[in-house]
Each structure stands twice: as C-alpha cells, then as structure tokens.
C-alpha cells in the first residue's frame, strides 16, 4: 500500500521511475506478485532483486508474526535487522548504474515506533551516505516520512491507486489475516478514507 501509493505519487509528480522489489525469503511473498502486477499496470519497469541473507525476524520465519496494533512491544519481532539499509544500498547502486539522480523510499510516521530504519534520523544518515558513497550524488526522496498511514491512504485514493491489487498482510496466506499489525494499520487507514 505504501510503496504503491509512493509509485503513483511520484508518477503524478512527473518522475521517470523504475521499481525494485526485494525477495528476502519473506513470509509475505505475495507482496512481490502485487508489485509486479502494479508495475505492469502502470508501465513501470520492475526488477526483482534476491537478498536471501536477511534473517532474524518473524517476517523471515524466525518466530510467529504477532497480532495486534503496531504500538505493542511484541511487534518488534517483525523488525528485519538492517533490512531497509541493505535495500537502500542496492537501490542507490542501481540508480547510479542506470543514470538516475534519486531513490524514493516509502517510510512513514506510522512505522517510526517499531522500525528504527524508518525514522528521520536514519533517513538523514542515509542521505549523507548517498552523498558520499560515489562520485555521483543521489537524492533520497521520502515524501511520506511525516505522514501517517491514513494520509497515505487518502493520497492514494486521490490518485486512484488500485488498493485491491496491493498486499499488506505479514502472514502471507491466500487472504489477509486481519490480525497482524500490518492488517490492523491498513484497515484503520482505509477507514480514514471514508471518514475524510
């Protein structure tokens, strides 16, 4: 939902886009199929990168996915150590190789509590790293950094994002579980569209 809305937001802003997805043997692999379909729908080039070395989280089958709201301490089990830094490193390398001057990252305020690599301090450190990692400086775009999930959902609704094609559930079944933190937060965000 976040990445798809980010894609539509950047297309609306006039950016030329290529999309990367990452297969880290995550439990919720359905998100990869969703990303492919959405990129086909929008005509955006999509590449799937393999990074199977990420482990140590309920999202990589190292324990059960906790149920409930993200604010709960148990949700820390869904942190994949250093995941976003690894993904951003791959993204900046790909951007430089392909002549892009920016990388977009869909982090948002709703993730700040649980995920250290979605916080402003992390983003600022990555911006500095992007400026120093190569002769070519690459800008890190984070338009949703201070937005909550409801704001992202409402922006997506404005852009006619096909939310029905997106996948959010951490369980990875055939249907969303409706109980994991990702499902709970998505339901609240979607309800905010109707309330607006």
What are these regions (language model features)?
Residues 111, 190-191:
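Glycine-rich nucleotide phosphate-binding loop and flanking beta-alpha elements
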Residues 172-173, 194-196:
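Short cysteine/histidine-rich metal-coordination sites, predominantly Zn2+-binding motifs
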Residues 187, 193-194:
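Flexible, glycine-/basic-rich loop-and-beta segments that form/coincide
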Residues 1-160:
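ATP-dependent adenylation/nucleotidyltransferase module used to activate substrates
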Residues 89, 165-188:
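Local cysteine-cluster metal-coordination motifs and their immediate loop/turn environment
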């Amino acid at each position: 939902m976040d990445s798809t809305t980010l894609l539509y937001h950047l297309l609306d802003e006039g950016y030329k886009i290529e999309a990367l997805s990452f297969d880290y043997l995550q439990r919720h692999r359905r998100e990869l199929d969703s990303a492919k379909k959405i990129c086909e729908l929008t005509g955006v080039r999509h590449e799937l990168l393999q990074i199977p070395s990420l482990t140590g989280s309920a999202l990589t089958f190292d324990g059960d996915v906790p149920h409930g709201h993200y604010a709960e301490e148990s949700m820390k089990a869904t942190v994949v150590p250093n995941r976003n830094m690894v993904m951003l490193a791959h993204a900046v390398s790909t951007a430089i190789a392909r002549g892009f001057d920016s990388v977009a990252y869909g982090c948002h305020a709703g993730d700040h509590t649980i995920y250290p690599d979605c916080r402003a301090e992390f983003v600022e450190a990555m911006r500095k790293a992007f400026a120093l990692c190569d002769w070519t400086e690459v800008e890190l775009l984070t338009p949703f950094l201070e937005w909550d999930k409801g704001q992202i959902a409402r922006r997506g609704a404005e852009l006619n994002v096909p939310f029905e094609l997106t996948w959010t559930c951490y369980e990875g079944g055939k249907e969303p579980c409706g109980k994991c933190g990702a499902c709970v937060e998505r339901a609240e965000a979607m309800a905010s569209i109707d309330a607006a």
